[in-house]
Amino acid sequence: ATLVGTIGKVSGAHVNPAITAGLWTLKKIPTPNALIYIAAQLLGGASALAIVEYVTNSDVVASGMSTMDGRVFLAEALGTAIFGFGVAAVVMQKLEGMQAAFTVGASLFLGVLVAAMAAPGFLNPAVALANNSWDRTTVIAPLLGSIVGMNVYSFFLAPADSLKSSKKK
C-alpha cells in the first residue's frame, strides 16, 4: 500500500512480475513496457539478493522448496489471484490515492494470509528471487494466479467503460 501511495502516480507501482503479467493480459500495459518492467523487477530482486549476501558476508539460505508441492503451488496461486483481483479492481475502476492504496493493500494482505497457510506467501517472483527461493512454484503459481484473478474480475465485475478503454489500446 505504501508503494501504491508513494510511486503509483509515477510508475504505476510496477514491482511485481506476476501483477505486471496479469495487467498485460488485460491489455492495460503494452508488450514492450511489460517486458521492460518484468526485466527491471527481476533485476531488482537479483540485486537485493546480491546486496544482502555481500553485506552479511554469507549466502542467503533458500526456503527449501526445491520440489513441486501441489498444496504450496495452489496456495501461492490462490493468494496471488486474490491480490490480482484487487489490483484489477483498482485499475478498472480507476481508483486513486488512498482508496487505491487501501484496496491494493487489503488484497495483498488477504492474499498473503491465504498463501501463508501452506506456502511462504511471496506472491511475487522478484521477492522469491531476492529470498533465494526461485523455483517453479514461486514463479509459475503467482503468474497463473494473477492472470486468473485479474481476468475473473474483468469478466464478471469490470465496469463497461474500463473494458472499452482496454480494447482501444
Language model features by range: what are they?
Residues A1-K169:
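Membrane-interface helix-loop junctions and terminal tails of multi-pass membrane proteins
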